[in-house]
Amino acid sequence: MSAPLSVFVTGTDTEIGKTFVSAAMLHGFARHGLRAAALKPIAAGAYERDGVWRNEDADQLDAAANVALPPELRTPFLLKAPAAPHIVAAQEGVTLDLDTIVACHREALTRADVVVVEGVGGFRVPLNDTQDTADLAVALGLPVVLVVGVRLGCISHALLTADAIRQRGLTLAGWVANHVDPAMSFADENVATIRDWLARERRAPLIGRIAHMTPAAPESAAAMLDIAALVESLRTARH
């Protein structure tokens, strides 16, 4: 049996569909015949149901995965307030410990063929006074998929994030264009520019373009992703 695959999903910003795309990837991996699990190691914003604190993003990932992980393994750090994690963690007396997340990820790899790890916010969101989400990606040692929210300003955001990923010594395994603004002018031209630059500078393929959906439908979006190409990219990045 081949070693399990894993990928760290980050975004050009917050609220650009990172969870939506992660869920679509999980559906795609499952259709590809893989046992797919999800980690949302840090989640900010919780609600209580039946005496249990939950997070909407984590719920979406659970619904898409075909391997269920215990909540404490899937999300070791669940913060109640929906705000920047380092601020909320300090207020709630929580230390966001990377070693704990790495241990959870290691355990998840024993239960699935592929583990999708969704970051929090963009690529450099502070987690404490000295570490950010880029440090988390480095600690996990994973290739990265970048979700680009296609809206005004996305070209610079995409290229800057790709530079930051490279500076941390990580592989950009691919990127996804998620059309968050249906009224955006020159959307095709923006996507083409990002595609050409990331292919030339990072050899990072465009994994898929996801049309604007209302409501969001990750299972339908999975058909817009080239999962076979992503699997090959993840396998290549591992060697």
UniProtKB/Swiss-Prot annotation:
Primary subcellular site in the record, as a coarse category: cytoplasm
UniProt catalytic activity: (7R,8S)-7,8-diammoniononanoate + CO2 + ATP = (4R,5S)-dethiobiotin + ADP + phosphate + 3 H(+)
Active site residues according to the UniProt entry: K40
Known cofactor(s): Mg(2+)
InterPro entries: DTB_synth_BioD, P-loop_NTPase
Localization: Cytoplasm
GO molecular function (one): dethiobiotin synthase activity
SUPFAM superfamilies from the UniProt entry: P-loop containing nucleoside triphosphate hydrolases (SSF52540)
Any single GO CC term annotated in Swiss-Prot or TrEMBL for this entry: cytosol
The enzyme's E.C. designation: 6.3.3.3
Record-level GO BP terms: biotin biosynthetic process
Domain of life (superkingdom): Bacteria
Top-level EC class as recorded in UniProt: ligase
Keywords, sorted A to Z: ATP-binding, Biotin biosynthesis, Cytoplasm, Ligase, Magnesium, Metal-binding, Nucleotide-binding
Annotated pathway: Cofactor biosynthesis; biotin biosynthesis; biotin from 7,8-diaminononanoate: step 1/2
Binding site for Mg(2+): T19, D57, E118
Residues holding ATP: E15, I16, G17, K18, T19, F20, D57, E118, G119, V120, G121, N178, H179
PANTHER family from the UniProt entry: DETHIOBIOTIN SYNTHETASE
Protein family membership: Belongs to the dethiobiotin synthetase family.
UniProt subunit comment: Homodimer.
The protein's role, per its UniProt record: Catalyzes a mechanistically unusual reaction, the ATP-dependent insertion of CO2 between the N7 and N8 nitrogen atoms of 7,8-diaminopelargonic acid (DAPA, also called 7,8-diammoniononanoate) to form a ureido ring.
Protein name as annotated: ATP-dependent dethiobiotin synthetase BioD
Natural source organism: Burkholderia orbicola (strain MC0-3)
Gene encoding the protein: bioD
